[in-house]
Amino acid sequence: MNIKNLNQIPIVVEQSARGERAYDIYSRLLKERIIFLVGPIEDYMANVVVAQLLFLESENPDKDIHLYINSPGGSVSAGLAIYDTMQFIKSDISTLCIGQAASMGALLLTAGTKGKRFALPNVRCMIHQPLGGFSGQASDVDIHAQEILKVRANLNQIFKLHTGQVIKTIQKDTDRDNFMSADEATKYGLIDKVLAKR
Protein backbone atom coordinates (compact mmCIF):
# COMPACT_ATOMS: atom_id res chain seq x y z
CA MET A 1 0.00 0.00 0.00
CA ASN A 2 1.46 3.35 -1.04
CA ILE A 3 1.93 5.72 1.91
CA LYS A 4 0.79 8.78 -0.08
CA ASN A 5 -2.64 7.15 -0.56
CA LEU A 6 -3.28 6.89 3.19
CA ASN A 7 -5.24 10.14 3.23
CA GLN A 8 -7.70 8.53 0.79
CA ILE A 9 -8.48 5.52 3.00
CA PRO A 10 -11.87 5.90 4.70
CA ILE A 11 -12.06 5.99 8.49
CA VAL A 12 -14.81 4.17 10.41
CA VAL A 13 -15.81 5.51 13.83
CA GLU A 14 -17.41 3.09 16.29
CA GLN A 15 -19.18 3.92 19.52
CA SER A 16 -18.62 1.78 22.58
CA ALA A 17 -19.18 2.03 26.33
CA ARG A 18 -15.66 3.43 26.61
CA GLY A 19 -16.15 6.12 23.96
CA GLU A 20 -15.31 6.40 20.28
CA ARG A 21 -12.73 4.41 18.39
CA ALA A 22 -11.55 5.25 14.86
CA TYR A 23 -10.26 2.60 12.45
CA ASP A 24 -9.09 2.81 8.88
CA ILE A 25 -11.51 0.69 6.85
CA TYR A 26 -8.98 -2.11 6.24
CA SER A 27 -8.22 -2.50 9.96
CA ARG A 28 -11.93 -2.59 10.70
CA LEU A 29 -12.48 -5.30 8.08
CA LEU A 30 -9.50 -7.24 9.48
CA LYS A 31 -11.46 -7.46 12.75
CA GLU A 32 -14.08 -9.34 10.69
CA ARG A 33 -11.33 -11.64 9.31
CA ILE A 34 -11.36 -9.99 5.88
CA ILE A 35 -8.07 -9.34 4.07
CA PHE A 36 -7.85 -7.26 0.90
CA LEU A 37 -5.26 -8.26 -1.71
CA VAL A 38 -5.52 -5.32 -4.10
CA GLY A 39 -3.11 -4.16 -6.80
CA PRO A 40 0.17 -5.57 -8.05
CA ILE A 41 1.63 -8.36 -5.93
CA GLU A 42 5.05 -7.26 -4.68
CA ASP A 43 7.21 -7.92 -1.62
CA TYR A 44 5.81 -5.26 0.71
CA MET A 45 2.20 -6.18 -0.02
CA ALA A 46 3.00 -9.90 0.34
CA ASN A 47 4.59 -9.31 3.75
CA VAL A 48 1.50 -7.42 4.93
CA VAL A 49 -0.86 -10.16 3.68
CA VAL A 50 1.30 -12.91 5.24
CA ALA A 51 1.35 -11.03 8.56
CA GLN A 52 -2.45 -10.63 8.46
CA LEU A 53 -2.93 -14.35 7.71
CA LEU A 54 -0.66 -15.35 10.59
CA PHE A 55 -2.34 -12.89 12.95
CA LEU A 56 -5.84 -14.11 12.13
CA GLU A 57 -4.77 -17.74 12.53
CA SER A 58 -3.30 -16.95 15.94
CA GLU A 59 -6.56 -15.23 16.96
CA ASN A 60 -8.71 -18.25 16.02
CA PRO A 61 -7.32 -21.09 13.89
CA ASP A 62 -10.75 -22.70 13.52
CA LYS A 63 -12.48 -19.70 11.98
CA ASP A 64 -12.42 -18.92 8.23
CA ILE A 65 -10.31 -16.11 6.80
CA HIS A 66 -11.80 -14.22 3.83
CA LEU A 67 -9.32 -13.07 1.16
CA TYR A 68 -10.76 -10.56 -1.33
CA ILE A 69 -8.65 -10.38 -4.50
CA ASN A 70 -8.49 -7.63 -7.14
CA SER A 71 -5.02 -7.97 -8.65
CA PRO A 72 -3.30 -7.93 -12.05
CA GLY A 73 -0.64 -10.28 -10.64
CA GLY A 74 2.99 -9.46 -10.07
CA SER A 75 6.08 -10.99 -8.52
CA VAL A 76 6.16 -14.79 -8.49
CA SER A 77 8.28 -14.97 -5.33
CA ALA A 78 5.99 -12.54 -3.47
CA GLY A 79 2.92 -14.44 -4.66
CA LEU A 80 4.38 -17.78 -3.60
CA ALA A 81 5.11 -16.36 -0.13
CA ILE A 82 1.37 -15.67 0.22
CA TYR A 83 0.47 -19.03 -1.35
CA ASP A 84 2.73 -21.02 0.96
CA THR A 85 1.33 -19.22 4.01
CA MET A 86 -2.24 -19.92 2.86
CA GLN A 87 -1.39 -23.62 2.65
CA PHE A 88 0.61 -23.59 5.90
CA ILE A 89 -1.92 -22.13 8.31
CA LYS A 90 -4.74 -24.15 9.86
CA SER A 91 -7.60 -21.73 9.10
CA ASP A 92 -9.72 -22.32 6.00
CA ILE A 93 -9.31 -19.49 3.52
CA SER A 94 -12.28 -18.35 1.47
CA THR A 95 -11.15 -16.47 -1.65
CA LEU A 96 -13.36 -14.02 -3.53
CA CYS A 97 -12.39 -12.30 -6.77
CA ILE A 98 -13.69 -8.75 -7.11
CA GLY A 99 -12.64 -7.07 -10.37
CA GLN A 100 -9.80 -9.24 -11.63
CA ALA A 101 -7.48 -12.04 -10.65
CA ALA A 102 -4.72 -12.31 -13.22
CA SER A 103 -1.44 -14.21 -13.20
CA MET A 104 -0.37 -14.67 -9.54
CA GLY A 105 -3.73 -13.20 -8.54
CA ALA A 106 -5.45 -16.15 -10.26
CA LEU A 107 -3.12 -18.62 -8.56
CA LEU A 108 -3.98 -17.16 -5.14
CA LEU A 109 -7.69 -17.18 -6.00
CA THR A 110 -7.65 -20.90 -6.82
CA ALA A 111 -5.49 -21.64 -3.74
CA GLY A 112 -8.38 -20.98 -1.37
CA THR A 113 -10.03 -23.83 0.49
CA LYS A 114 -11.90 -26.14 -1.91
CA GLY A 115 -15.59 -25.27 -1.88
CA LYS A 116 -14.84 -21.73 -0.65
CA ARG A 117 -13.41 -20.14 -3.81
CA PHE A 118 -15.74 -17.54 -5.30
CA ALA A 119 -16.00 -14.71 -7.83
CA LEU A 120 -18.48 -11.95 -8.50
CA PRO A 121 -20.31 -12.19 -11.86
CA ASN A 122 -18.35 -9.62 -13.88
CA VAL A 123 -14.78 -10.45 -12.92
CA ARG A 124 -12.08 -11.55 -15.28
CA CYS A 125 -9.42 -14.10 -14.51
CA MET A 126 -6.26 -14.68 -16.51
CA ILE A 127 -3.64 -17.40 -16.36
CA HIS A 128 -0.36 -17.48 -18.27
CA GLN A 129 3.25 -18.58 -18.01
CA PRO A 130 5.61 -16.56 -15.82
CA LEU A 131 7.34 -13.57 -17.36
CA GLY A 132 11.07 -13.14 -17.16
CA GLY A 133 13.82 -11.04 -18.58
CA PHE A 134 17.54 -11.08 -18.03
CA SER A 135 20.58 -9.69 -19.79
CA GLY A 136 24.22 -10.43 -19.28
CA GLN A 137 26.69 -13.13 -20.23
CA ALA A 138 25.30 -16.03 -22.24
CA SER A 139 25.99 -18.51 -19.44
CA ASP A 140 24.06 -16.34 -16.95
CA VAL A 141 21.16 -15.91 -19.39
CA ASP A 142 21.03 -19.71 -19.73
CA ILE A 143 20.95 -20.15 -15.93
CA HIS A 144 18.02 -17.74 -15.67
CA ALA A 145 16.22 -19.38 -18.60
CA GLN A 146 16.48 -22.77 -16.88
CA GLU A 147 15.21 -21.25 -13.63
CA ILE A 148 12.16 -19.71 -15.27
CA LEU A 149 11.31 -23.10 -16.80
CA LYS A 150 11.47 -24.64 -13.31
CA VAL A 151 9.23 -21.87 -11.95
CA ARG A 152 6.76 -22.45 -14.79
CA ALA A 153 6.65 -26.19 -14.05
CA ASN A 154 6.09 -25.46 -10.35
CA LEU A 155 3.25 -23.00 -11.04
CA ASN A 156 1.63 -25.48 -13.44
CA GLN A 157 1.71 -28.15 -10.71
CA ILE A 158 0.02 -25.73 -8.30
CA PHE A 159 -2.72 -24.99 -10.84
CA LYS A 160 -3.13 -28.74 -11.44
CA LEU A 161 -3.46 -29.40 -7.71
CA HIS A 162 -6.18 -26.79 -7.17
CA THR A 163 -8.15 -26.94 -10.46
CA GLY A 164 -8.14 -30.68 -11.09
CA GLN A 165 -7.01 -30.11 -14.69
CA VAL A 166 -4.41 -32.45 -16.17
CA ILE A 167 -0.90 -31.04 -16.56
CA LYS A 168 -1.02 -31.07 -20.39
CA THR A 169 -4.14 -28.89 -20.30
CA ILE A 170 -2.51 -26.48 -17.84
CA GLN A 171 0.64 -26.28 -20.00
CA LYS A 172 -1.42 -25.52 -23.12
CA ASP A 173 -3.72 -23.06 -21.39
CA THR A 174 -0.89 -21.09 -19.75
CA ASP A 175 1.23 -20.90 -22.91
CA ARG A 176 -0.26 -17.48 -23.70
CA ASP A 177 -2.52 -15.06 -21.81
CA ASN A 178 -5.75 -17.00 -21.23
CA PHE A 179 -8.66 -14.83 -20.08
CA MET A 180 -11.76 -16.30 -18.44
CA SER A 181 -15.10 -14.95 -17.30
CA ALA A 182 -16.43 -15.94 -13.88
CA ASP A 183 -18.47 -18.77 -15.43
CA GLU A 184 -15.48 -20.00 -17.45
CA ALA A 185 -13.29 -19.88 -14.32
CA THR A 186 -15.88 -22.05 -12.55
CA LYS A 187 -15.90 -24.62 -15.37
CA TYR A 188 -12.09 -24.63 -15.41
CA GLY A 189 -11.88 -25.25 -11.66
CA LEU A 190 -10.21 -21.97 -10.68
CA ILE A 191 -13.22 -21.20 -8.48
CA ASP A 192 -16.16 -23.15 -7.09
CA LYS A 193 -19.05 -20.75 -7.55
CA VAL A 194 -20.08 -17.36 -8.91
CA LEU A 195 -21.80 -15.20 -6.29
CA ALA A 196 -24.40 -12.65 -7.39
CA LYS A 197 -25.65 -11.83 -3.89
CA ARG A 198 -24.72 -12.63 -0.27
Swiss-Prot record:
UniProt subcellular location: Cytoplasm
PROSITE patterns for this protein: CLP_PROTEASE_SER (PS00381)
Signal peptide region: none
GO CC annotation: cytoplasm; endopeptidase Clp complex
Top-level taxon: Bacteria
Annotated family: Belongs to the peptidase S14 family.
Name of the featured protein: ATP-dependent Clp protease proteolytic subunit
This protein's encoding gene: clpP
